[in-house]
Amino acid sequence: MEFRILYPSALLTQFVKYYWVFERNYLVRTIERGIPIGCMQLVFHRKNRVFSTAINDFQPKAFIEGHMSSYWDLQYEGENETIAITFTPQGVQAFFSTPLYEFYNKNIPVECIGDRLFIDLQQAILNADDKMDCIGIIECYLLEKIKNLKPEIAVSEVIIQQIEYDCNTSIEWLANVSN
């Protein structure tokens, strides 16, 4: 079994909390429990798909996992290789135009998001020779996506960073920055 956490490049740290890579060969069907982490994720299953009790179905090959409100069980069998992007709570909005509440307690297939870039990313990840090469591929795609970042997202990031830095920041200051 291999489980690794990798951190994003400096340009992506305000959007991506970390990447994780999981690989294991399950000789028998195995159930493992998933717990909410408070962040949305973009998940890729490069080998066998995983059955999730959260959606009572097999997870798609590539999907957005919204905020989950409770634990769920995952059934693994055979060779599994999962690569995921865990977004920062505020960073996810830079990549998806869909309102975030629409992802709540759901696993939305990449094809349903309506963004060609993520469909291309899915194909690149599934076709990559090595799981560690996938992180570099992901970084390139995400950097391409933030080139067209909406100004209001950049402003909200500044506001969140200021609140995290100094919780006594005045409402007036925050309002002035946001306008």
Show which residues each predicted segment covers.
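Alpha-helical bundle regulatory/interaction domains
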Residues: 1-172, 176-178
